């Protein structure tokens, strides 16, 4: 169901469903319920507005149809999306190839005359020129003390010698997303910075080494978190990773509470980080393809500490 503004685009993109262009949502729902004698309706949970949900429930009540409450459409969709087909994996790899190229490009662009915002724009422009239909999400570029904000917004702050620069970015190809984070240094770096970087790198490598089919997702999270917690407990507050596909954040997650069993064909990020408030932060992120024995790293960019 969509309105006139998106009708043509929906018909081009949606191949296995009938697209209904409505003028009045309630009337279109009513016609569908009546024509197909529908008695149970699954509602999308995360993005459906309360106003839209009220319309569905009101019309369902009029036609003795019941909105199903014990599950949601999201639940079914996320399970269907979790294991990627060969074509989906091909699209994700194509998006990551553009992302890797953007990282190589940006290393020669960064200097003390550039701001975080300018670096973010250059990454985005380069990816679009390389064939990305759009960027995967709002590009993150944070440096120096801004780096402790794990999802900080690029600012007008200029790069300074001694800064860590964290860049989190991705591309979209044929609707499929990529996601990568790299932290690089500009000029000289302190021993404390090097120690944090190596800890994050070791944590990420341990998690990737652990990732395989047939294990709980939280086992991968634990592999990374245990290494960070030895000397930096409390500085790694987000999950170790999330699935990627048609959306940038999909299910399942490499998270402490996620006991979902991994399956071959899942594409999930591995992105531990350490964030020292008011000082700096480090995050390293790759995407991995879960396989029967181990995983394939889809990210090609170097991740040893680069000092520009």
Region spans (language model):
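Active-site neighborhoods and metal-handling regions in enzymes and metal-associated proteins
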Residues: 1-308
């Amino acid at each position: 169901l969509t309105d006139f503004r998106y009708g043509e685009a929906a018909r081009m993109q949606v191949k296995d469903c009938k697209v209904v262009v409505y003028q009045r949502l309630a009337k279109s729902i009513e016609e569908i319920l009546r024509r197909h004698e529908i008695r149970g309706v699954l509602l999308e949970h995360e993005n459906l507005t309360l106003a839209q949900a009220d319309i569905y429930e009101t019309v369902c009540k009029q036609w003795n149809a019941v909105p199903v409450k014990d599950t949601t459409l999201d639940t079914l969709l996320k399970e269907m999306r979790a294991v990627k087909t060969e074509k989906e994996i091909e699209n994700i790899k194509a998006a990551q190839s553009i992302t890797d190229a953007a990282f190589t490009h940006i290393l020669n662009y960064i200097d003390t005359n550039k701001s975080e915002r300018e670096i973010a724009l250059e990454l985005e422009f380069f990816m679009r020129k390389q064939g990305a239909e759009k960027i995967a999400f709002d590009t993150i570029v944070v440096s120096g003390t801004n780096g402790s904000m794990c999802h900080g917004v690029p600012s007008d702050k200029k790069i300074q010698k001694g800064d860590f620069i964290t860049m989190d970015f991705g591309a979209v190809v044929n609707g499929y997303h990529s996601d990568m984070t790299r932290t690089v240094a500009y000029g000289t770096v302190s021993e404390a910075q090097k120690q944090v970087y190596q800890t994050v790198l070791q944590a990420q490598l341990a998690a990737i080494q652990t990732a395989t089919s047939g294990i709980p997702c939280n086992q991968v999270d634990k592999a990374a978190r245990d290494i960070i917690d030895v000397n930096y407990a409390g500085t790694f507050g987000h999950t170790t990773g999330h699935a990627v596909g048609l959306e940038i954040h999909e299910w399942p997650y490499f998270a402490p509470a996620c006991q979902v069993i991994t399956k071959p064909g899942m594409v999930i990020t591995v992105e531990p980080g350490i964030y020292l408030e008011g000082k700096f932060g480090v995050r390293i992120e790759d995407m991995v393809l879960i396989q029967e024995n181990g995983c394939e790293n889809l990210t090609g960019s170097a991740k040893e500490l680069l000092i520009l």
